[in-house]
């Protein structure tokens, strides 16, 4: 058995400022990450941790200067970090979910800042997976949707997402349960919990109807940046990237013909631990 004794999480937005043409991690984003990892390095030292598992995902994977950034991480913090493939990222997200949610057949998505991983699971086995390089941060930057957006802009983003998803040929033809991982999906769940006065402060395995998700997306996209910052349940620091992220989730749910969305509070980080502790 294992026991969780401490956890810490920080949103860095490593992909911020990285364009499809330049594909460079900006100095500002790198510095934010290095500052955060310096704190984690101190925690590792104080707690006398012997084994450290550290991986870098889409932002570093897609960046031309990703490898040199990881050298900086190693030199300044001592943390050895490995870039993982989109396939490995999908596998670890699945491990985080499969160990903590009892569901046999489902569609799983993990929406991050620079990519979304989608997996089709049958009888608790991943039969298809894909990593698509569109995330809440990169889409926001691509369409400049961080502040006010009009209906034309929303429809342009939707068409772009639909076009990307149309290339995934193995989407289930029959409706399947859909499980979501990531900060955007957790925020949508928090907004829903506040709206229905949900009595528990628990997001993991929280389930709500897709009609409510779509209603939330309509509400979010209809508000100004300042108004979004005041939405009950939405982290104010996510108010600028929530539109792009919410539209990705909406289009995945539509394509999957889903009736409900289930939230997993466990994802890649937990999957990394389970893969080490109990490989499947």
Residue spans for each PLM region:
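A structural signal for short, well-ordered beta-strand segments
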Residues: 8-12
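Dinucleotide-binding Rossmann-like beta1-alpha1 core, especially the glycine-rich loop
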Residues: 54
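A generic, well-ordered mixed alpha/beta core segment in the N-terminal half of proteins
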Residues: 105-119
């Amino acid at each position: 058995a294992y026991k969780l004794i401490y956890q810490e999480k920080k949103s860095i937005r490593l992909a911020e400022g990285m364009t499809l043409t330049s594909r460079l991690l900006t100095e500002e984003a790198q510095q934010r990450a290095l500052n955060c990892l310096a704190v984690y390095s101190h925690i590792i030292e104080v707690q006398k941790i012997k084994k450290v598992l550290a991986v870098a995902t889409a932002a570093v994977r897609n960046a031309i200067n990703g490898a040199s950034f990881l050298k900086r991480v190693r030199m300044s913090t001592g943390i050895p970090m490995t870039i993982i493939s989109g396939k490995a990222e999908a596998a670890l997200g699945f491990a985080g979910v499969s160990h903590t949610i009892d569901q046999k057949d489902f569609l799983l998505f993990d929406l991050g800042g620079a990519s979304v991983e989608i997996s089709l699971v049958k009888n608790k086995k991943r039969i298809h997976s894909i990593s698509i390089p569109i995330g809440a941060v990169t889409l926001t930057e691509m369409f400049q949707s961080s502040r006010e957006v009009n209906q034309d802009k929303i429809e342009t983003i939707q068409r772009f997402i639909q076009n990307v998803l149309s290339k995934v040929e193995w989407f289930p033809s029959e409706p399947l349960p859909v499980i979501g991982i990531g900060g955007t999906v957790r925020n949508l769940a928090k907004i829903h919990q506040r709206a229905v006065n949900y009595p528990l402060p628990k997001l993991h395995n929280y389930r709500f109807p897709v009609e409510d998700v779509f209603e939330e997306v309509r509400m979010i996209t209809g508000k100004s940046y300042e108004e979004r910052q005041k939405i009950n349940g939405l982290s104010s620091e996510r108010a600028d990237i929530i539109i792009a992220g919410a539209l990705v989730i909406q289009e995945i749910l539509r394509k999957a013909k889903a009736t409900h969305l289930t939230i997993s509070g466990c994802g890649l980080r937990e999957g990394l631990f389970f893969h080490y502790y109990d490989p499947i």
